[in-house]
């Protein structure tokens, strides 16, 4: 397989001390000031927390690279936009399936983050989202490597997930969190075909199990 090079990395993650805070039993991401990254106030106000987190991380990872040089945006998520999904389903139950606000449903779709990044920079290129739970990022990375193997020069790849109190409670009751700390965050990588002057790392393959 064609070697792939990591040129830039951006991350929004929990604090370094790895201790739950704000009276929450799970690790919550330390979010930046989004006003400096997502400058459109109207757009920013309409975004949910995970969408802002993912879009800001993706834009930071792109840096000063011209949007025309991005041949693809590939995102991955295990559970998607949980807050908006919960909000829409609660409205569905509370209003007995009548007079529903469509915004939470629109914002809860899995491809929202990749689409918003493309819309902000007018990137008319390959755009894909993988939702395979624990294999989501590996699937996105493998897709990016295949696209680069076919001739693409630069691909933006990212993984985003959020944790909510409802999701945490359900996972805990099902025994899914034994021995691990639940958390959330966003991570993006700018991958390229050529090594360039200062690549951060080289990826030679992807192994899943």
Where are these regions (language model features)?
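Short-chain dehydrogenase/reductase
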Residues: 141
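Conserved "HGTGT" condensation-loop signature of ketosynthase/thiolase-family condensing enzymes
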Residues: 1-138, 146-152, 160-209
